[in-house]
Amino acid sequence: MEAAAVTVTRSATRRRRRQLQGLAAPEAGTQEEQEDQEPRPRRRRPGRSIKDEEEETVFREVVSFSPDPLPVRYYDKDTTKPISFYLSSLEELLAWKPRLEDGFNVALEPLACRQPPLSSQRPRTLLCHDMMGGYLDDRFIQGSVVQTPYAFYHWQCIDVFVYFSHHTVTIPPVGWTNTAHRHGVCVLGTFITEWNEGGRLCEAFLAGDERSYQAVADRLVQITQFFRFDGWLINIENSLSLAAVGNMPPFLRYLTTQLHRQVPGGLVLWYDSVVQSGQLKWQDELNQHNRVFFDSCDGFFTNYNWREEHLERMLGQAGERRADVYVGVDVFARGNVVGGRFDTDKSLELIRKHGFSVALFAPGWVYECLEKKDFFQNQDKFWGRLERYLPTHSICSLPFVTSFCLGMGARRVCYGQEEAVGPWYHLSAQEIQPLFGEHRLGGDGRGWVRTHCCLEDAWHGGSSLLVRGVIPPEVGNVAVRLFSLQAPVPPKIYLSMVYKLEGPTDVTVALELTTGDAGSCHIGGISVLNAETSSRHSLRPLRVPPTKLARWVGRCGRQLSGGWVQHCYEVSLRGCLLLDLLVCFSRPPGSREEESFTCRLGEIQVVDAASLLAPLPQVQAVTISHIRWQPSASEREGPPALLQLSCTLHWSFLLSQVRCFRIHCWGGMSDDSPGRELPRPEMPMFLGLAFATQYRIVDLLVEAAGPGQDRRMEFLVEPVPKEGFRVPQAEWGRAVLLYSAPA
């Protein structure tokens, strides 16, 4: 249901707000009516900045309980929440065309620049995510309420992420694409055919002329390009006729060529299944029977039942493309495999010995098969055992901002202020994760630092990074490297760190960085040049932050709510490459004892000073559509006093400048569902995060309009800049919904 829109000035809007707060409201008008624009004395809402001539769009709606059906492919049938989806047949694939609803599933995050690039010949690590059929809690694009969701956060060890399911065309849920891209990891969907039905599907597009298979390839490329992921794993798990298998290499070559043209860095991989005779016959290696498929695309993913002799034989077959062979490792250890489960390191030891890439299949084993309450401990144990075989990659662009949020939590916090209580899970909200693990000093090993993700407290989002350690008596400090970067830096950068120490301790905390190109690199704003290397620097906190940067540094040097402290730094550089971010923990002056510490990191930011002064565009053209009304669940009989409102917001904004959008409203009410809390009177109610220029509001509790009355809802869209500061409310986008009872 579309609401009729009219435009009014703020003065008319304020007059109507006063009417709705107790005065008699005028009769509801028709859709063509416009609100009068007679100026009135202005009364400011606390905390709001009002521009005199600013206009807002008002949508009029007469409440109706008639259904407004939404397409089930794009919306959960029970809640109408937007969901990620798959395609189940060749017909669905060929018929796919972009629709407005597809916009929910388009990735906001482009693939981040990284070093080394994926095209380098360093052996890579591929993670193939296969969990209980796929499209579980991760299908809810705007998040969901989940007590113990699965989380992956060792991204700096991963080069390629494949989302796997047994549906014909598996389009990765957008949350995975956003999160992986943020970490410089490319994302592949899966094109799979299986059993007799799969055989018929393959014959339909492969046994004919080139137009048939080119149409399928073109559609796969269009889907990749539209949803902004990076390519496909091709998995043919059925026998092929001679005609069909003969057309498979040209299909792969055409798909790979077209993808490379349309998607920078695009990737097509072939799974070890069918051989060149058309038989379904897994080889567990690259050999003369399947080499033709490897030669036709970007890489080869082997089956899992290999032995070291398979790896040795593959050396000759792979030649200079050794890194393009991804040796499959089933973490569930099904079949006659090497390693698996907590012995997966045995598989990787052999694979890396021979210089191949690795494909870890279903590492969600730690979540599916072990106790959920021990998930984080088991996840860290699993990846910790693989650490020596997993080379990391570096992020190489600014701004660099992270609150360590995992995209989940037991409550939601916004810059130290609690917004909502209750479990939540939103994959797109996961921010850049650090290098995890335990770091020990040399010698007797008494000095150590460990990092863990922790849901118990947060500065922004739902989690923080817990750093525990011991400073032994013989050293003055210990440091932990959190991020590997290779970022060219502008002449001046600002850095910020939010942290808090727990328990009685006098240990001091400092942010450090390392720089490259030391011969020509000049750096200002440092307090200590580490004696071990001229490229590691300890930063000097700003005592008086520049007033022109108040919106970013307003909290610098202050003790904040919840015990958090924020330090800000200004660093001048010339000809430098930013390599690492470290946090250093130093013993108090005069101390000669062993010092233990527990520190919680809430946020780290590295931003170009010039970007903080650049104006941010405003959110434009907010619209309201697909409105659905329901009586409150507790008032199914008689005239309802409360209603449940669902609707979709759309707006315009330059996506390259934002991390996400925060959606709020005036006029909504708290309900009993977890994660939603009645706001303070001077604050709008937070509804959720959007990682697209559209957002579906679902079952918002509102007051019913009485006879002859209008009720008012105001929806606000807050852009969150990549630099990580809050935008004043006057710069948010907004739209008003005026609704009335039927005549």
Swiss-Prot record:
Residues recorded with modification Phosphoserine: S66
Tissue distribution: Widely expressed. Expressed at higher level in thymus and spleen.
Main location: cytoplasm
Disordered, as annotated region: 1-55
Residue span, BRCT domain: 291-383
Alphabetical list of InterPro entries matching this protein: BRCT_dom (IPR001357), ENGase (IPR032979), Glyco_hydro_85 (IPR005201)
Region forming the signal peptide: none
Catalysis performed (reactions): an N(4)-(oligosaccharide-(1->3)-[oligosaccharide-(1->6)]-beta-D-Man-(1->4)-beta-D-GlcNAc-(1->4)-alpha-D-GlcNAc)-L-asparaginyl-[protein] + H2O = an oligosaccharide-(1->3)-[oligosaccharide-(1->6)]-beta-D-Man-(1->4)-D-GlcNAc + N(4)-(N-acetyl-beta-D-glucosaminyl)-L-asparaginyl-[protein]
Subcellular location as annotated: Cytoplasm, Cytosol
PROSITE patterns cross-referenced by the UniProt entry: BRCT
Superkingdom, natural source: Eukaryota
An annotated GO BP: protein folding
GO cellular component, one term: cytosol
Modification type N-acetylmethionine: residues: M1
GO MF term set: mannosyl-glycoprotein endo-beta-N-acetylglucosaminidase activity
Family as reported in the entry's similarity comment: Belongs to the glycosyl hydrolase 85 family.
Protein name: Cytosolic endo-beta-N-acetylglucosaminidase
